[in-house]
C-alpha cells in the first residue's frame, strides 16, 4: 500500500481507538457518516513524518445493482513525494460493510490499472477489515472518547466537528456534514491530516479499462 494510504489508516487507528464516553452521541455521528451518495468526495493533505506533503482523496465513483442490492465503487487516491496509487473496491456499503469486497481495481503510478480476480478477494477483504481507514473509523468511532463539539479551521473552511481523543495522544475531528466524516486528525507520531476540499461530483481517477489480473494457480494434491 502506498505510504499516504497507509498513513491514513494509521490516523484512523490511533485517533479513534479510545475509552467509551458519550457513546450515544458518537454512535449517531458514525451512523450518519456511513451513508454514502454517488459522487461524494473529500480530499486531504498530510504533514509531518514520512508522509509530509502527501495528498489523499476518498470518493464514491460508481455504483452497480446486483440482485436486490446496490454496490458502490469506493476509491482511495493517494500521492506522496515517493509514490502514488489508486485503489477502488466494490462494496455493499460504507463502514463495517466495507470488508465485504465484491471487486477491486488497483493502479500504481504509471502502471496499467489491474482488476483482481475473484479468488483473491477473500484475502483482500481480510486486509481491508484490518487496514481500511473508512472501516476503522466506522468500527472505532462509536467507542472513542468524546472531548466535545468544536469549530475547526481547515483549508476547506471552518467546520463544526466532534473532537475524539485516545489515551495515547491520537485525535480526530469528525462531522456528519463532511463526506466520510474526517475533518482533521493528529496521530501520536506527530503526523497531521486536514481536509482541503469536498464535493458531490467525483469521477473515477482511473480512465483506462483495467487489465484482468490472472488468477492464482492452485496446485493439485
Regions found by a protein language model. Name each.
Residues 19-23:
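Sec/Tat signal peptide C-region and signal peptidase I cleavage site
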Residues 7-17:
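Bacterial N-terminal signal peptides
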Residues 24-100, 107-221:
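Acidic, serine/threonine-rich low-complexity disordered tracts
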Residues 1-4:
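Positively charged n-region of N-terminal signal peptides that target proteins for export
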Amino acid at each position: 500500500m502506498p505510504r499516504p494510504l497507509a498513513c491514513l489508516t494509521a490516523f484512523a487507528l490511533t485517533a479513534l481507538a479510545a475509552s467509551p464516553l458519550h457513546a450515544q452521541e458518537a454512535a449517531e455521528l458514525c451512523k450518519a457518516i456511513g451513508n454514502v451518495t454517488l459522487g461524494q468526495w473529500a480530499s486531504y493533505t498530510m504533514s509531518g513524518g514520512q508522509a509530509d506533503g502527501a495528498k489523499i482523496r476518498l470518493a464514491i465513483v460508481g455504483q452497480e445493482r446486483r440482485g436486490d442490492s446496490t454496490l458502490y465503487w469506493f476509491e482511495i487516491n493517494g500521492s506522496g513525494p515517493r509514490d502514488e496509487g489508486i485503489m477502488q473496491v466494490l462494496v455493499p456499503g460504507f463502514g463495517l460493510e466495507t470488508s465485504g469486497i465484491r471487486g477491486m481495481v488497483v493502479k500504481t503510478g504509471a502502471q496499467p490499472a489491474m482488476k483482481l480476480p475473484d479468488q483473491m478477494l477473500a484475502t483482500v477483504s481480510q486486509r481491508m477489515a484490518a487496514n481500511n481507514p473508512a472501516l476503522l473509523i466506522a468500527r472505532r468511532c462509536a467507542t472513542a472518547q468524546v472531548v466535545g463539539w468544536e469549530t475547526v479551521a481547515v483549508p476547506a473552511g471552518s467546520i463544526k466537528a466532534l473532537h475524539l481523543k485516545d489515551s495515547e495522544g491520537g485525535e480526530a475531528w469528525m462531522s456528519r456534514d463532511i463526506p466520510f466524516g474526517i475533518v482533521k486528525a493528529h496521530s501520536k507520531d506527530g503526523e497531521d491530516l486536514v481536509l482541503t476540499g469536498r464535493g458531490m461530483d467525483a469521477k473515477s481517477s482511473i480512465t483506462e479499462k483495467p487489465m484482468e489480473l490472472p488468477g492464482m494457480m492452485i496446485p493439485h494434491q
